[in-house]
């Protein structure tokens, strides 16, 4: 019953009837699944606490205390609200770890495939939502409220499918074609959303995966020099390709056909024509430089209006490069957590991530590294799938250890 409630929640996660940040229908089903999982575990007297998640519990205590202190000082309700977000994430992590099994993962992968096909049907039916730029450009966002939100959902679904694919002991032609077909579908949908953050994630994923394959083949080949020459040629061709897409000094994205490539060129142009303050300002991260003391002990998560840049800050910016004013959270999961809670809680959370990832299948690390690389561009760590991918890495690592132990004993 709990597994089915979980699957329904995953399917409903793509439907946003209320503004982002509100409680959605999927959250209600996730909560119901969590309650049913807890009841089932308590009734069967199975494990209710996992030692692997002790660092998470420590981080949660820090987060509750820090947000509590700032709530007492400011009476701003955003602080307890963000604490509840973290408690919710902990509950979902516990539930996912408890439900994790071969049958559960098979069902989850099927729901992920259904989600991707559904968004494709929404695209071709013409009923999807679009984000309209001020000058007329459009980005597809399916049934979501934001194109980056849509792209992140598709991206994490792709990673879940990859993690499930790598759990298989035997790879048939049907399995390979089925998986990579869905992966290409996901890449196509991300292209429609024109998300540069997800592009970075996919780029890291393929670079790590290709690097692993190249290293393995090179080490076991009798023609190592040939492999090294081939690798060098590939890097040169890649560099030439990057050089060819570099935008000119007068680049204007509004004068292009507005594709993912033109958005990448736009980002490159901004980096080339701006400075460090421009880059930070675009991510709402100027506070990292203006008030670095919070990196030590934390600013709490909420009441972001406190960090409106001081008068005269605009003089540090390059005119005409960035024109968006932010007063919200930092657009980077890692730096937002670090700034909000300080160096010790952030280090504890990083330790938990490393523990879950370090012993998993090498290829699966490509998926986790891609997720972490993408998380530096957007604040996505409140999304359930962000943590599910990391927990999957940890659970597959445990399975690997068990298999190795059984092999040795056998």
What name fits each language-model region?
Residues 105-131, 145-215:
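Alpha-helical transmembrane segments of multi-pass inner-membrane proteins
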